[in-house]
Amino acid sequence: GVVVGGGLLGLEAANALKSLGLQAHVVEFAPRLMPVQLDDQGGALLRQKIEDLGVQVHTEKATTAIVPGSDARLRMNFADDSHLETDLIVFSAGIRPQDTLARACGLEVGERGGIVVNNQCTTSDPNIHAIGECALWNNRIFGLVAPGYTMARTLSAALNKDTGAAFTGADMSTKLKLLGVDVGSIGDAHGQTPGARNIRFHDEQAGQDMHQTQHA
């Protein structure tokens, strides 16, 4: 089986296929696994760990077509003229905000989708609110459940006349849940915040790598 998407859910899905006795592959468009949470060094180490589990990893692969295969049910054609045949494809390639109703109602939506909300999770119509993965806050869509919970608490407080209620962001820490592979990511993993400094701790013998970003 092939999982399209090398993020958290994609890797967990690939591990599930492997545990069922299937030959598992991960196909990722980016040059590394978990591209949002990890840098190049962390991604390389994770790839090694994942392949040690028996899951084959294919990065920098853009799927151009899925057609009937010759040795398997399906054939995935990639932009680099390579291909991969499989009987099963699982897509775990990110989220897309469900904002069709909001568009139909004339609410403000983002250029790439998502219902625009303010710090009180209120849309462009003061009588309509949005939370979770459909909400676009500060030009950002959150693809994790934790921010949705935080938004829900904020909105509940605001509806109960708490004038101090405000959504100011959420805990974006993530942890990969695979047997024998421990990966955690918190904060600004890529050090893109102005004034950030990267500090790296690497234990080659133990196969452990940790990056810490500090801000001036």
Kindly give the residue locations of the regions a language model identified:
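Feature captures the FAD/FMN-dependent oxidoreductase FAD-binding
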Residues: 65-72
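Mid-to-C-terminal Rossmann-like scaffold of FAD/NAD(P)H-dependent oxidoreductases
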Residues: 134-216
